[in-house]
Amino acid sequence: MAVRQALGRGLQLGRALLLRFTGKPGRAYGLGRPGPAAGCVRGERPGWAAGPGAEPRRVGLGLPNRLRFFRQSVAGLAARLQRQFVVRAWGCAGPCGRAVFLAFGLGLGLIEEKQAESRRAVSACQEIQAIFTQKSKPGPDPLDTRRLQGFRLEEYLIGQSIGKGCSAAVYEATMPTLPQNLEVTKSTGLLPGRGPGTSAPGEGQERAPGAPAFPLAIKMMWNISAGSSSEAILNTMSQELVPASRVALAGEYGAVTYRKSKRGPKQLAPHPNIIRVLRAFTSSVPLLPGALVDYPDVLPSRLHPEGLGHGRTLFLVMKNYPCTLRQYLCVNTPSPRLAAMMLLQLLEGVDHLVQQGIAHRDLKSDNILVELDPDGCPWLVIADFGCCLADESIGLQLPFSSWYVDRGGNGCLMAPEVSTARPGPRAVIDYSKADAWAVGAIAYEIFGLVNPFYGQGKAHLESRSYQEAQLPALPESVPPDVRQLVRALLQREASKRPSARVAANVLHLSLWGEHILALKNLKLDKMVGWLLQQSAATLLANRLTEKCCVETKMKMLFLANLECETLCQAALLLCSWRAAL
């Protein structure tokens, strides 16, 4: 009983306080009838009905109803206070107060309009991206129709050497499917698993006119320290398997299933500007053409008495590309526009790596392959992932606890934040913009100059010590936007450097969005209209031609990776550069 009286007394005091704040003590809030507190104001005793002869009544209602009544009273009070504030601000505060209130309302309206415009732009970009994501997939796999084949070295016809690096040799190859092809290749001295240099004595070494072409390339890794077991080889050389396709390691007939460890490398999603490993398997090391001359020391002792290599190694099967970027630039001088498109392709590939949490760490013109479209325009593909950082557990943040931690393969094109890093208990190297810096250095080669980070002499720069003012100027024929972008990519501080995605968007806008950038007031709705026009034109161009040209492919990649935020960043960056000229 005492508890109930205490609660009732507290409720009465609360109501009295609320009534005093409103200035109308005779009414309860939202109910339209006098409350108990009204009697207190008139001097009446709470708990008794007004008037003579009235019977006494209990104070308040039951506890749940009392709380409901209190909640309704507070809600009514809040609504009336809000109405009073609006009335006073509009009618009682004078002209100055009205102006402030009007400006505040207009500001809120403008903010809401901007937010609605931004939401519409983001939604449009997402819809465009969804359409082109399905249309920007890589081309068909040459071995798609032979999913159960290609996992043994004996199934391939190996031709001449394509090239060699510091850890592998690459040979041209093909895989016959019909018996008549085998008969033709036997007559030319090409035997399964053997090259022309290993054919039997007395067999012809020249190819007949009907000899098959070599659409594939086989990369034979040099195994010096991995041992001879297949599982040890796959684990030691696992970085080479990062760009492997889903079926590359799923073979039968002697192929070893790769057991991916918890700290193993990531599997890279396919991208048109990144190499695909079609098959990967281990096999005995054969004596291939030029082996005794080009790399005798890494051969097993059964092939060369002084060889240090093991008897088995890893073989990777890929598409055969005509040349590397370095070889292409030795005999070709691309126009400034074509060179900008080549630079754009590298940035698209690097952006895909960053989105996947992978750093290549060995980008150079020798590790970039080139093929030509029907119009002779080069299509670039990033290859050789032997030095990549693709750890599931750390992503692009490499703990640098000691000098024994591997920072990558190419010291000349190592970004400043990597080359100047010093080990420590909490030291971390951020590779999120390191490959983009390397692309900026390769841009000099693409535009016809010597890479300033190669060679010797006064013109040679080192990534650990150079200053931006020392960077050589690109030719005047290069568009100003591209020159500014290359200098931005080579900023020493990674925080001042644009990401690969923003840099790619800068080139897209510079190449195909000139009339949008020419507008004095660049608005989102204008940008969305331009994107819709580009989408329609790109879809039409893609349907009218059997094989897309490089320009159409690049537009499709741009629209497949479309993000409103990064596109606006690129547009603002371009506008700031042009305003500074």
Swiss-Prot record:
<keyword id="KW-1000">Mitochondrion outer membrane</keyword>
<keyword id="KW-0547">Nucleotide-binding</keyword>
<dbReference type="GO" id="GO:0004674">
    <property type="term" value="F:protein serine/threonine kinase activity"/>
</dbReference>
<dbReference type="GO" id="GO:0030335">
    <property type="term" value="P:positive regulation of cell migration"/>
</dbReference>
<dbReference type="GO" id="GO:0072656">
    <property type="term" value="P:maintenance of protein location in mitochondrion"/>
</dbReference>
<dbReference type="GO" id="GO:0007005">
    <property type="term" value="P:mitochondrion organization"/>
</dbReference>
<feature type="active site" description="Proton acceptor">
    <location>
        <position position="362"/>
    </location>
</feature>
<dbReference type="GO" id="GO:0016242">
    <property type="term" value="P:negative regulation of macroautophagy"/>
</dbReference>
<dbReference type="GO" id="GO:0051443">
    <property type="term" value="P:positive regulation of ubiquitin-protein transferase activity"/>
</dbReference>
<dbReference type="GO" id="GO:0030426">
    <property type="term" value="C:growth cone"/>
</dbReference>
<dbReference type="GO" id="GO:1903298">
    <property type="term" value="P:negative regulation of hypoxia-induced intrinsic apoptotic signaling pathway"/>
</dbReference>
<dbReference type="GO" id="GO:0043422">
    <property type="term" value="F:protein kinase B binding"/>
</dbReference>
<dbReference type="GO" id="GO:1903751">
    <property type="term" value="P:negative regulation of intrinsic apoptotic signaling pathway in response to hydrogen peroxide"/>
</dbReference>
<feature type="modified residue" description="Phosphoserine; by autocatalysis">
    <location>
        <position position="402"/>
    </location>
</feature>
<feature type="transmembrane region" description="Helical">
    <location>
        <begin position="94"/>
        <end position="110"/>
    </location>
</feature>
<dbReference type="Pfam" id="PF00069">
    <property type="entry name" value="Pkinase"/>
</dbReference>
<dbReference type="GO" id="GO:0010821">
    <property type="term" value="P:regulation of mitochondrion organization"/>
</dbReference>
<keyword id="KW-0597">Phosphoprotein</keyword>
<keyword id="KW-0809">Transit peptide</keyword>
<dbReference type="GO" id="GO:0004672">
    <property type="term" value="F:protein kinase activity"/>
</dbReference>
<dbReference type="GO" id="GO:0002082">
    <property type="term" value="P:regulation of oxidative phosphorylation"/>
</dbReference>
<dbReference type="GO" id="GO:0005743">
    <property type="term" value="C:mitochondrial inner membrane"/>
</dbReference>
<dbReference type="GO" id="GO:0061136">
    <property type="term" value="P:regulation of proteasomal protein catabolic process"/>
</dbReference>
<feature type="modified residue" description="Phosphoserine; by autocatalysis">
    <location>
        <position position="228"/>
    </location>
</feature>
<keyword id="KW-0523">Neurodegeneration</keyword>
<keyword id="KW-0460">Magnesium</keyword>
<dbReference type="GO" id="GO:0005737">
    <property type="term" value="C:cytoplasm"/>
</dbReference>
<dbReference type="GO" id="GO:0097237">
    <property type="term" value="P:cellular response to toxic substance"/>
</dbReference>
<dbReference type="InterPro" id="IPR011009">
    <property type="entry name" value="Kinase-like_dom_sf"/>
</dbReference>
<dbReference type="GO" id="GO:1903852">
    <property type="term" value="P:positive regulation of cristae formation"/>
</dbReference>
<dbReference type="GO" id="GO:0090258">
    <property type="term" value="P:negative regulation of mitochondrial fission"/>
</dbReference>
<dbReference type="GO" id="GO:0045727">
    <property type="term" value="P:positive regulation of translation"/>
</dbReference>
<dbReference type="GO" id="GO:0000287">
    <property type="term" value="F:magnesium ion binding"/>
</dbReference>
<dbReference type="GO" id="GO:2001171">
    <property type="term" value="P:positive regulation of ATP biosynthetic process"/>
</dbReference>
<dbReference type="GO" id="GO:1903214">
    <property type="term" value="P:regulation of protein targeting to mitochondrion"/>
</dbReference>
<dbReference type="GO" id="GO:0097449">
    <property type="term" value="C:astrocyte projection"/>
</dbReference>
<dbReference type="GO" id="GO:0022904">
    <property type="term" value="P:respiratory electron transport chain"/>
</dbReference>
<feature type="domain" description="Protein kinase">
    <location>
        <begin position="156"/>
        <end position="511"/>
    </location>
</feature>
<dbReference type="GO" id="GO:0051897">
    <property type="term" value="P:positive regulation of phosphatidylinositol 3-kinase/protein kinase B signal transduction"/>
</dbReference>
<dbReference type="GO" id="GO:0044297">
    <property type="term" value="C:cell body"/>
</dbReference>
<dbReference type="GO" id="GO:0032226">
    <property type="term" value="P:positive regulation of synaptic transmission, dopaminergic"/>
</dbReference>
<keyword id="KW-0907">Parkinson disease</keyword>
